[in-house]
Amino acid sequence: MSDLCPPTAPFFGFMGAAVALIFANLGAAYGTAKSGVGVSSMGVMKPDLVMKSIIPVVMAGVLGIYGLIIAVIIGNGVKGPEGGKPQYSSFTGFAHLAAGLACGLSGMAAGIAIGIVGDAGVRASAQQAKLYVGMVLILIFAEALGLYGLIVGLILTSKEAPCS
């Protein structure tokens, strides 16, 4: 057994997969719930605008997919011992943990932003139609925050060091 590949290294990889999925889905759930409340409130007064105003809910849901992508890639990259010898280095485990944290936490931040903007934006655009384009632009920038985390996570999952 080498200091480069301790038996605890896979724990960090699996934690990376878990935090990517958990935090990204927390953000997606918050964004969906918060903007869904806005859509529901607006739909009482103007039901014809409900389908047009569903964009924040969909954008928040996509954040959960980002976390799922990183979690699956990390989960497939974690290697168990072969013939009693570890095959997964601590460098790789820490890289996978960093990938999960980058994707998960940026997904959570994006979900919070999408929820707040979606709730207020949907209600405001029901009152003043000109605000719809501005709301969509702000939502796109908020979604980009989650996308940045996905990109960094994908780069970090490709980093690995051999055990030899």
From Swiss-Prot:
It is found in: Vacuole membrane. The chain crosses the membrane at residues 11-31, 54-74, 97-118, 131-155. Pfam families: ATP-synt_C (PF00137). Keywords: Hydrogen ion transport, Ion transport, Membrane, Transmembrane, Transmembrane helix, Transport, Vacuole. GO terms for cellular component: proton-transporting V-type ATPase, V0 domain; vacuolar membrane. It comes from Chrysotila carterae. The gene is VAP. The record marks 143 as: Essential for proton translocation. Residues 32-53, 119-130 are cytoplasmic. Proton-conducting pore forming subunit of the membrane integral V0 complex of vacuolar ATPase. V-ATPase is responsible for acidifying a variety of intracellular compartments in eukaryotic cells. This is V-type proton ATPase 16 kDa proteolipid subunit. V-ATPase is a heteromultimeric enzyme composed of a peripheral catalytic V1 complex (main components: subunits A, B, C, D, E, and F) attached to an integral membrane V0 proton pore complex (main component: the proteolipid protein; which is present as a hexamer that forms the proton-conducting pore). Belongs to the V-ATPase proteolipid subunit family. One of its GO terms (molecular function) is proton-transporting ATPase activity, rotational mechanism.
